[in-house]
Amino acid sequence: MNPSTKINPFLALLFHLFLVSSFLASPSALAQLYSADKGRVIYGHHHINTQNLDAHKRFWLEGLGGETRELGETRREVIAFPDVLVFLTEASPTSGTRGTIVNHVGFETTDIYADVARLQALGYAMITREELPETYEVIDGIGQRVAGNTIAYVLGPDDIKVELIENKEIAHNIQMHHIHWASEAGEDMRAWYAEHLGAISGLRIGQPAGQLPNVNLTFGPSETRLARTQGTVLDHIGFEVKDLKALCEELEAKGIVFDRPYVEIPALGLAIAFFTDPWGTYVELTEGLDSI
């Protein structure tokens, strides 16, 4: 540009506004925990144990459509979906999710047929038929029934089980939907999560459930007490909290003994705490993931 060229102030302002609006509209510029302002406690993350990080990145990114983000000064890589983050730790899992207290995690998707076709093309096993009752007709890995949901189940690396539920009305192509426990004490679990994390008690698919702003906590049946999550492929589940320190103090007053008490980690821009619920679910509480 010629140094003597004058810039029209009005055009300069329009250009500036264009850049700002483009940034705000960019998916990479938006926080992934969209529901962070809708409640004191929301769902935050799944934490995966695996010896094959690349296999899980392929599953969560290519298979399910997540995106990569970075956390804190260490720029730790995180896989992001609307209303849930996925953390990967290099460690040998003791088992998959089936047979543990948390049987699977669930997402809603606007196009289950495209998702299942993509997952099958990538070589992942669709286990829908074995997971659904005979009232569902299953074709090409997708289950349907009259007046019911269109759903599918996929088995990912290290035998992590994921459910997909079609919902064409959601705001994103895919987003967090539910955590599905398997327990002989579903009603007790519902009451416990209502008291300690503020989940609103109700039912989902006829099973005891609790609702938080961005996740349903579904407490499905099991005839026996199942394995704890810590050390398995889904090592723990995570809830994002406003004023975590205060909540930890409240939980301690209610008798919760923390596996790892409240601590702040400036390099990650986080505060965290860990406890295990009475049925063996390893739970992390965080404050700061809503900035990703």
Predicted features along the sequence, with ranges:
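N-terminal secretory signal peptides that target proteins for export/translocation
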Residues: 1-12
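Solenoidal tandem-repeat scaffolds enriched in leucines and small polar residues
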Residues: 189-190, 197-206
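Conserved active-site tyrosine of GNAT-family acetyltransferases
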Residues: 56-61, 119, 159, 189, ...
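Bacterial N-terminal signal peptides
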Residues: 12-26
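Mature N-terminal segment immediately following signal peptide/propeptide cleavage
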Residues: 37-73, 77-78
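Sec/Tat-exported extracytoplasmic proteins
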Residues: 47-50, 63-68, 106-109, 123, ...
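Vicinal oxygen chelate
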Residues: 31-38, 41-52, 77-78, 95-181, 202-212, 216-221, ...
